[in-house]
């Protein structure tokens, strides 16, 4: 669908994002999401959720899911999110997400979902054995965003297509139910440096919690010694660092480590090269390790402290869920009226 703009959304700006509780968070999550969430809370009304409904599109251990939800919440707070500024909550605690998702399933077209490349990547050769939830995942994502009438969504490369689908669903709903401007057409917040952190063992693969090698990633719960050891053992090449970004781009592992340094230091890659061009990794790695420990070790310490008192975390999540429901309920009530449901 193409955007039509005779009537635009007139509500207040709001940002929404979430992370699945499907494993330990790592440096890629920290630089690609958590740091940006922390910054956004000071600039715009911010809703950050734990995406547990999305997590169960693939099997999750029921005995571990609640604790994994706490771990994501602990990571949010340890990274600098303030529960008094940002609304932090578990997705499953706000039933309006699921209700709006069903309505959107009836608005979205099958052809739109057939074009979603992420389902093809995640289902692989076993599409017939994948859950229906994995296929309709982008529709729930649209409901996550639009139940709060979020106007901005931080996205990486792998989520841009889903945000376009959200815009299509919003536009079609507004048109079908004669409600111009009811839902916003959310804009992407394109993520800058640090948005794509690669494996420490393979510069061509994204850093991932599913990689069998723990040395491929820096976990947020790693100790200072763990962090330093992983940086020291990170894969590199024998050449000194180059002078230009163009040369750096041809060396995947070097490019990744320089990118990590730049993101942690709040610099550009060019600025890092200005300091380290011509120097070998015997000089660069210790500097990167020191910076990574300085940046990440306190986050791990705060996380461990928060997880040591689950009652406090649960209270934060319950309060956030209540606040989220207060924002979501009026939207769903209006949607039901527009659709024409009995009693609405």
Curated annotation (Swiss-Prot):
Function noted in UniProt: Catalyzes the attachment of tryptophan to tRNA(Trp).
UniProt keyword Electron transport, yes or no: no
Keyword Ligase: yes
Organism encoding this protein: Caulobacter vibrioides (strain ATCC 19089 / CIP 103742 / CB 15) (Caulobacter crescentus)
SUPFAM superfamilies for this protein: Nucleotidylyl transferase
Binding site for ATP: 20-22, 28-29, 156-158, 197, 206-210
Family annotation (CDD domains): TrpRS_core (cd00806)
Pfam (any one): tRNA-synt_1b
Reactions accelerated catalytically: tRNA(Trp) + L-tryptophan + ATP = L-tryptophyl-tRNA(Trp) + AMP + diphosphate + H(+)
InterPro entries: aa-tRNA-synth_I_CS (IPR001412), aa-tRNA-synth_Ic (IPR002305), Rossmann-like_a/b/a_fold (IPR014729), Trp-tRNA-ligase (IPR002306), Trp-tRNA-ligase_bac-type (IPR024109), Trp-tRNA_synthetase (IPR050203)
Motif placement: 'HIGH' region: 21-29
Enzyme Commission numbers on file: 6.1.1.2
Record localization: Cytoplasm
Keywords: Aminoacyl-tRNA synthetase, ATP-binding, Cytoplasm, Ligase, Nucleotide-binding, Protein biosynthesis
Family: Belongs to the class-I aminoacyl-tRNA synthetase family.
Name of this protein: Tryptophan--tRNA ligase
Positions annotated to bind L-tryptophan: 144
Gene: trpS
Motif ('KMSKS' region): 206-210
Catalytic class of the enzyme: ligase
Self-association and partners: Homodimer.
Coiled coil stretches, renumbered: none
One GO MF term attached to the UniProt entry: ATP binding
GO BP term (any one): tryptophanyl-tRNA aminoacylation
Primary localization class, coarse: cytoplasm
GO cellular component, one term: cytosol
């Amino acid at each position: 669908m193409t955007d039509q703009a005779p009537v635009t959304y007139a509500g207040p700006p709001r940002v929404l994002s979430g992370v699945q509780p499907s494993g330990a968070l790592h440096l890629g999550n920290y630089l690609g999401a958590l740091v940006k969430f922390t910054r956004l809370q000071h600039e715009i009304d911010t809703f950050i959720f734990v995406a547990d409904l999305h997590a169960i599109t693939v099997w999750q251990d029921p005995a571990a899911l609640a604790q994994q939800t706490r771990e994501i919440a602990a990571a949010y707070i340890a990274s600098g999110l303030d529960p008094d500024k940002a609304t932090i909550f578990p997705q499953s605690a706000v039933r309006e997400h699921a209700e709006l998702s069903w309505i959107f399933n009836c608005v979205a077209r099958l052809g739109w979902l057939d074009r979603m490349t992420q389902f093809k990547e995640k289902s692989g050769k076993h599409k017939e054995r994948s859950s229906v939830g994995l296929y309709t995942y982008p529709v729930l994502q649209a409901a996550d965003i639009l139940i709060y009438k979020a106007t901005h969504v931080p996205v990486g490369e792998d989520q841009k297509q889903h945000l376009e689908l959200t815009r299509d669903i919003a536009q079609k709903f507004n048109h079908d139910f004669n409600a111009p401007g009811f839902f916003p057409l959310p804009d992407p917040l394109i993520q800058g440096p640090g948005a794509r952190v690669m494996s420490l063992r393979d510069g061509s693969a994204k850093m991932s919690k599913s990689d069998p090698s723990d040395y491929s990633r820096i976990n947020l719960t790693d100790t200072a010694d763990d962090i330093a050891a992983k940086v020291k053992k990170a894969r590199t090449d024998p050449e000194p660092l180059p002078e230009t970004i163009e040369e750096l781009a041809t060396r995947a592992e070097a490019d990744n480590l320089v990118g990590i340094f730049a993101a942690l230091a709040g610099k550009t890659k060019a600025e890092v090269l200005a300091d380290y061009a011509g120097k070998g990794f015997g000089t660069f790695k210790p500097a990167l390790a020191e910076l990574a420990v300085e940046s990440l070790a306190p986050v791990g310490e705060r996380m461990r402290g928060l997880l040591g008192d689950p009652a406090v975390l649960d209270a934060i999540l319950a309060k956030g869920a209540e606040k989220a429901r207060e924002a979501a309920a009026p939207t769903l009530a209006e949607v039901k009226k527009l659709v024409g449901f009995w009693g609405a």
